[in-house]
A protein has these predicted regions:
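Catalytic strand-loop segment that frames the active site of acyl-thioester-processing enzymes
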Residues: 1-30
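Residue-level preference for beta-strand/loop junctions
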Residues: 3-5, 58, 74, 88
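Well-ordered beta-strand positions in beta-sheet-rich domains
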Residues: 6-10, 61, 93
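Residues at secondary-structure transition points
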Residues: 30-34, 61
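Short, residue-level hotspots on alpha-helical faces of the histone-fold
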Residues: 37-41, 45
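Hydrophobic beta-strand-centered segment that forms part of the acyl-chain substrate-binding groove
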Residues: 44-77
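Hydrophobic beta-sheet segments that form the core/acyl-binding groove
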Residues: 64-97
Length: 97
């Protein structure tokens, strides 16, 4: 597998995606768990076509910073880029906006 593989996952923030509904906060903004799931989805899909049959990816470490909240109705995109390959360990840079 080579560096540079990318994928963008897209989600429209709806009620079920909010911090209030997911129990991770008390506001109707995109929940952190939803954002992280979208980011993991982008990483998984970036490399899925290149994995051996029957293989998948699992998250091992996530380091994220929030810049602004995403209100209901806003479309959020998470773009993952494979930036490092060390044996079976894959490292991604992922931006959600």
């Amino acid at each position: 597998m080579e560096k540079g593989l990318t994928y963008t996952s897209v989600l429209k923030a709806e009620k079920q995606h909010t911090a209030l509904e997911m129990g991770s906060g008390d506001m109707h903004v995109l929940a952190t768990p939803t954002m992280v799931a979208l980011m993991e989805n982008a990483a998984m899909n970036a490399v899925a076509p290149h994995l051996p049959e029957g293989s998948t990816t699992v998250g091992g470490m996530i380091n994220t910073t929030h810049i602004k909240p995403s209100p209901l109705g806003e479309t959020v995109q998470a773009t993952a880029e494979l930036i490092e390959v060390e044996g079976r360990k894959l490292t991604f840079s992922i931006q959600a906006k």
